[in-house]
Amino acid sequence: KPEMLMELMVMAYKSDDGYEDKEVSESEINNRNVMARCSFHILYNLSCCPGVDNHGNVNPNILRTYIYRLYELSVEHHRTQVVDMMVGSLLGNLPRNDSYPQSVLGEIVEELKSDSVDEHIRIKIFNSRGVTTRAFAEGGNQERSLVALFKSYRDKVRFKYPRLAKIFTNLMREYEHYANHEDYIAQLEDLEY
């Protein structure tokens, strides 16, 4: 429920106006700090997306309703400065299966027209890769396969959802940069042996 997510956001992030209860005991401050850290940890590690079933199918109505309700709650709870980050992270968690990128993702991105949401989608997708290992002097082959994957995503949406296409283009550029860097590292490793 978006209300539960907003509760975590309220505990993890200060309000837009910076207002905090001034008259609280030291133990209450310590409790709030612990709750803030725990809430932030939960939010940061959230790997699901609303409206997605156990098979990776997305219900567009549930997802859209959830996202827009989260925006309403952010106004009520004075957390409008962090809601884009959370929405971007949620949308970045959509399953990258055969139907990816889902049309609802493109629709929401185009409706919101938020550079901040777009950037947090990109960050979430990029960070979802995790740590990589590679063979000696392998170079940037892993990254180039990701460039090709994101190019295929971009090509699917480029005319209908230009903002989403831009996210995929930025991911392509980022992985191309890392591919070139890994090629350089491989050349150095090759010279050493």
Language-model regions, residue ranges each:
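Inter-repeat boundary and helix-capping residues of tandem alpha-helical solenoids
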Residues: 136, 143-144, 161-162
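Short amphipathic alpha-helical heptad-repeat segments
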Residues: 139-151
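Residue at a conserved register position within TPR or TPR-like alpha-solenoid repeats
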Residues: 157-158, 175
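Non-catalytic all-alpha helical scaffold/repeat segments
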Residues: 1-129, 192
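Short, charged, amphipathic alpha-helical segments
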Residues: 164-174
